[in-house]
Amino acid sequence: MDFVKELKSSQDYMNNELTYGAHNYDPIPVVLKRGKGVFVYDIEDRRYYDFLSAYSSVNQGHCHPDILNAMINQAKKLTICSRAFFSDSLGVCERYLTNLFGYDKVLMMNTGAEASETAYKLCRKWGYEVKKIPENSAKIIVCNNNFSGRTLGCVSASTDKKCKNNFGPFVPNFLKVPYDDLEALEKELQDPNVCAFIVEPVQGEAGVIVPSDSYFPGVASLCKKYNVLFVADEVQTGLGRTGKLLCTHHYGVKPDVILLGKALSGGHYPISAILANDDVMLVLKPGEHGSTYGGNPLAAAICVEALKVLINEKLCENADKLGAPFLQNLKEQLKDSKVVREVRGKGLLCAIEFKNDLVNVWDICLKFKENGLITRSVHDKTVRLTPPLCITKEQLDECTEIIVKTVKFFDDNL
């Protein structure tokens, strides 16, 4: 490891990563070395507001001391034993999760993509064993422009050509419908071989697309009418991001299955969870699904503490309190911008859509960085604004100034 001493500048570190790592990402040119709360710091110790939050993984803020201590304390005792044995941590975590979210059972996995893959299997099995769909005929409805990961099942469910190009053949029997379109959904639900509808309460990777208030009550009603599982992918929208513990709580509905991930560990460890009641979850029998790392003692301890921080520090309430004024303030200050098409969001899951014929969002992200705020674009026209939920009003006001200043720079240089 003597070569580490040769790495001095940000460019050295970037060149090192590009030389020895696969080129499956195109990072913003900043080399981060530490984080605390809403801030991250590069190797030259420049400070930035983090407005990506690792795609909403650090809702609790970077390196939260309580979560970190829970992680260290458990790591000193037992990190993994596999599900071949019971542990003294997993059952505690499972009980905490099911009580908190109001479901009978939880299945612990590691990543959001694994949660989605688990849901595909769970829903298909329920379809065959409970709904009595003919063998190998089960179908799952998803929405256009959804995003649930980059595993083969997830890209099979996707409509993103970049995710699918040269990765076929794909998993069959995913039906695609427009988002926020109950008429199109009902048309597909009439197929008796449909077992599930999997949907994001807000479409994040599509550009933070917020549905109409009537959409999810309509979804719940239609799924019940046609005996189809309503599955909410809350991996990004859940755990306070939109101002509620679950985004579906805004709409007064309870999905049959909930998918969670990202902030389930506060950014300290990969943890995901699938929640459902017994009539759904118990179709899975021993040996039919699992993961070596899923539900390990270290993950269980971290998960419980991350959720306690979310609840005890009232981070959901903070996102709810700050989100709407932040959004309204941005809309008001950017209403005359020549490069902004729309400002939208829910809670602290926000975005600005730019006119990509006038401005390049990559350049906007670079200017944000220069001005002390880092985030990332969604495709070629939208920039996410998703700070940790521990952000204060004063900090958010300062960030609003940075955002407006950055947009004004591009307005003035058209």
From Swiss-Prot:
EC number: 2.6.1.13
Keyword Transferase listed: yes
GO molecular function: identical protein binding; ornithine aminotransferase activity; pyridoxal phosphate binding
Cofactor(s) in the UniProt record: pyridoxal 5'-phosphate
Keywords from the named record: Aminotransferase, Cytoplasm, Disulfide bond, Pyridoxal phosphate, Transferase
One Gene Ontology term, aspect cellular component: cytoplasm
GO annotation, biological process: arginine catabolic process to glutamate; arginine catabolic process to proline via ornithine; L-proline biosynthetic process; ornithine metabolic process
Enzyme class: transferase
Top-level taxon: Eukaryota
Regulation of catalytic or functional activity: Unlike for mammalian OATs, activity is increased by TRX1-mediated reduction of the disulfide bond between Cys-154 and Cys-163. Binding to TRX1 may also induce conformational changes that facilitate substrate binding.
Catalysed reaction equations from the record: a 2-oxocarboxylate + L-ornithine = L-glutamate 5-semialdehyde + an L-alpha-amino acid; L-ornithine + 2-oxoglutarate = L-glutamate 5-semialdehyde + L-glutamate
Subcellular localization, as worded in the UniProt entry: Cytoplasm
Annotated disulfide bonds: 154-163
UniProt xrefs under PANTHER family: AMINOTRANSFERASE CLASS III (PTHR11986), ORNITHINE AMINOTRANSFERASE, MITOCHONDRIAL (PTHR11986:SF18)
NCBIfam families noted in UniProt: Orn_aminotrans (TIGR01885)
Record note on quaternary structure: Homodimer.
Family to which this protein belongs: Belongs to the class-III pyridoxal-phosphate-dependent aminotransferase family.
Record's function text: The enzyme has a very narrow substrate specificity and can only catalyze the transamination of alpha-ketoglutarate with ornithine or N-acetylornithine and, to a lesser extent, of glutamate-5-semialdehyde with glutamate and alanine.
Name of the protein in its database record: Ornithine aminotransferase
UniProt source species: Plasmodium falciparum (isolate 3D7)
